[in-house]
Amino acid sequence: MNKSIKTKKQVSKTLIKLLNYKPLDLITIKELTEKANISRTAFYNNFHTLEDVLKYIYQNAHKQVFKDKYSHLSYEHIKDMIHFFDKNSKLLLVLIKWNLIEFIAKYNTEIVLSYTQHYKNKFIREHAFYFISYYHGSLFNICTYWIASGKQESSDTLFKMIKEFEKIKFVYNQKG
């Protein structure tokens, strides 16, 4: 493993540990580098800010599950999203605790936006941001709620619930 990757992993691991008991805005780069046993120069050779570290952590977690494989929508995507939240729930719960989940949601939107360029559906490509807000935003919020409430349902049950939500159509009362 090259030195840069090793440093990034050490910084990431240390930041997650610190976030377990301290909000991001109270963590300093000096404190992080001391706890990670690296120099500040090594930190700045790899990152500019603590937010960059969070982005790196999330990006790696995301790549491990999704592997840039979505050119169309499928139930597999929903299963992978649930798996991602299940596998990374410790990290995501820490982010929720310190109100940083919106930072990750924004980054998630950027990732999904890059996927939509490859979707076969022209309408989705033309209205990508609205689509992401409607579809992926809903999945992200459902999965966030699931882990924040202690994963009371199994991942299979959550998947079945989402499939049922997918079937529901908006019905307006015609009796008016």
What would you call each of these model-derived segments?
Residues 20, 27, 57-81, 92-93:
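Amphipathic alpha-helical linker/stalk segments
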Residues 1-4, 172-176:
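N-terminal intrinsically disordered/low-complexity leader segments
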Residues 1-22, 26:
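Basic, helix-initiating cap at the start of DNA-binding domains
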Residues 80, 99-137, 141, 171:
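Amphipathic alpha-helical packing segments from all-alpha helical-bundle domains
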Residues 33:
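The alpha-helix within a helix-turn-helix
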Residues 126-169:
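Hydrophobic alpha-helical segments that form the core
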Residues 37-46:
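Short hydrophobic/aromatic patch on the recognition helix
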Residues 26, 49-54:
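Short amphipathic alpha-helical segment with a characteristic S/N-K-E followed by hydrophobic residues
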